């Protein structure tokens, strides 16, 4: 841990983390809040459902391209400079989106927003590692977890309330003043805590990273809509896979790589990465499946569906600071292993939901699942990063955040694919094709998709048995 900022003044960790919490909360709120407005946007701009999905795909694609090179940016620019740049991009993107008269301009606004998020998240994790000692990082990461989990949880509910009373533009207008406050707060309290080394920039590595991670994220993000047999998806996977292979080979053979893969020599980092990867797949697939189930099988309105999922999301966020303190006191094993056990139990019962399952049952099962995931996510991530030497913090945070985006895209695509296959199989044996059969087929498909989540949770539980407190 550093005691002084690069200018010589004493580091004040609390105001620094508060700056990140404000900016991060609004950034991540905006990321998910727009999901509730997609059906409205189809009518407003007279576009197809495939086109409107680009608001999500484009956002994920921008993250997938920029987050991998964030390790380089962290070594080239100061903490204050990157923070102001990130929040400025978020403000500009939000303003463009709020004023958008066309879908194309809204799309540009979303991409600009994503640039801000892609810069902010790795910077936030890297700064926490630098300003907090190891025995306090769990609590600090828990506060970050509160934002990362809580903002996406309340986003759909708040946006649903906005959409019932105002137009979709107000999702962005309401976010704008809070981002400006975060920028002003950061101008006063943000300090330079990182060391600017300005390593050599390898253009070929950046190109390979962009093609590799961008291609993979795009392929999986598009697969749910276009299908795995789509030429676009197949070409993206092939190009992305080849580029990733060449990227890894180049990083291993370079003296000063863009992304230092030596982080994988540290076993707790690698294990933590696997556990976070699995957890994110479970979260993102659940965020896709349960709204579909609630709105179709239980015939709830979008706002009501958001309310059903709100308790679990809020619990997940509120648990993060608590699990962070427990991590500091007892280490990762006391949290991660029980967390996966809780997740396995919740997912087992989610595989058995039916058309007549009550909303209360879904609230309970979703809340239990979110509690389990909160016991896994931040402890596994913090423990993994703790094992790295400070010089590898930028690379470790970049890799951790990159694979979260990749895992989210994969989890969503696989869940939708399994659900669609389950629907099709059910309809082939169903008597008739009326509304009741359609609802029953969707429910059967969602059951199958939750089996995938259950299998991932079981794999996570087995892997968690090997976790040890990093030294």
Swiss-Prot record:
Localization terms from the record: Cell membrane
Membrane topology category: Multi-pass membrane protein
GO BP, one annotated term: response to antibiotic
Domain of life: Bacteria
InterPro entries to which the protein is assigned, alphabetical: EmrB-like (IPR004638), MFS (IPR011701), MFS_dom (IPR020846), MFS_trans_sf (IPR036259)
Molecular function, one GO term: transmembrane transporter activity
One of the record's GO cellular component terms: plasma membrane
Main location: membrane
SUPFAM superfamilies with a match to the protein in the record: MFS general substrate transporter
Spans through the membrane: 13-35, 55-77, 84-106, 111-133, 140-162, 167-189, 201-223, 227-249, 269-291, 329-351, 358-380, 445-467
UniProt signal peptide: none
Keywords attached to this entry: Antibiotic resistance, Cell membrane, Membrane, Transmembrane, Transmembrane helix, Transport
Role noted for this protein: Proton-dependent transporter. May mediate the efflux of lincomycin.
Family affiliation: Belongs to the major facilitator superfamily. EmrB family.
Protein name stated in the entry: Lincomycin resistance protein LmrB
Species classification: Bacteria, Bacillati, Bacillota, Bacilli, Bacillales
């Amino acid at each position: 841990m550093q005691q002084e900022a690069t200018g010589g003044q004493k580091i004040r960790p609390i105001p620094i983390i508060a700056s990140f919490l404000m900016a991060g909360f609004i950034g991540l709120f905006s990321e998910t809040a727009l999901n509730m407005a997609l059906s409205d946007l189809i009518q407003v701009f007279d576009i197809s459902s495939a086109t409107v999905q680009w608001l999500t795909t484009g956002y994920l694609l921008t993250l997938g391209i920029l987050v991998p090179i964030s390790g380089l940016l962290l070594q080239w620019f100061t903490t204050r400079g990157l923070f102001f740049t990130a929040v400025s991009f978020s403000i500009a993107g939000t303003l463009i989106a709020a004023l958008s008269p066309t879908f194309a301009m809204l799309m540009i606004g979303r991409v600009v927003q994503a640039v801000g998020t892609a810069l902010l998240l790795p910077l936030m994790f890297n700064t926490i590692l630098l300003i907090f000692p190891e025995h306090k990082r769990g609590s600090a990461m828990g506060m970050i977890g509160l934002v990362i989990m809580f903002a996406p949880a309340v986003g759909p509910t708040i946006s649903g309330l906005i959409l019932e009373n105002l137009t979709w533009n107000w999702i962005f207008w309401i976010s704008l003043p809070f981002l400006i406050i975060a920028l002003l707060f950061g101008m006063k309290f943000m300090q330079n805590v990182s060391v600017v080394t300005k390593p050599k920039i390898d253009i070929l590595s950046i190109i390979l990273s962009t093609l590799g991670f961008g291609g993979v994220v795009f392929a999986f993000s598009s697969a749910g809509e276009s299908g795995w047999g789509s030429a676009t998806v197949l070409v993206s996977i092939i190009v992305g896979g080849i580029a990733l292979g060449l990227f890894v080979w180049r990083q291993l053979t370079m003296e000063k790589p863009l992304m230092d893969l030596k982080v994988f020599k540290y076993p707790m980092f690698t294990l933590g990465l696997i556990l976070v990867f699995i957890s994110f797949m479970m979260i993102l697939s659940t965020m896709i499946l349960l709204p579909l189930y609630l709105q179709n099988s239980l015939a709830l309105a979008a706002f009501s569906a958001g309310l059903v999922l709100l308790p679990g999301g809020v619990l997940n966020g509120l648990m993060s600071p608590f699990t962070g303190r427990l991590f500091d006191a007892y280490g990762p094993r006391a949290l991660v292993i029980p967390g996966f056990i809780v997740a396995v139990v919740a997912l087992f019962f989610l595989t058995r939901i039916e058309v007549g399952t009550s909303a209360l049952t879904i609230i309970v099962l979703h809340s239990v699942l979110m509690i389990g995931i909160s016991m896994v996510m931040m402890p596994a991530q913090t423990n993994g990063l703790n094992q790295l030497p400070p010089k590898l913090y930028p690379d470790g945070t970049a890799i951790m955040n990159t694979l979260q985006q990749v895992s989210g895209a994969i989890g969503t695509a696989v869940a939708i694919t399994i659900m669609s296959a389950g629907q099709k199989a059910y309809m082939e044996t169903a008597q008739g094709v009326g509304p009741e059969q359609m609802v029953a087929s969707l429910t059967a498909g969602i059951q199958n998709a939750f089996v995938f989540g259950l299998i991932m949770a079981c794999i996570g539980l087995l892997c968690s048995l090997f976790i040890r407190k990093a030294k």
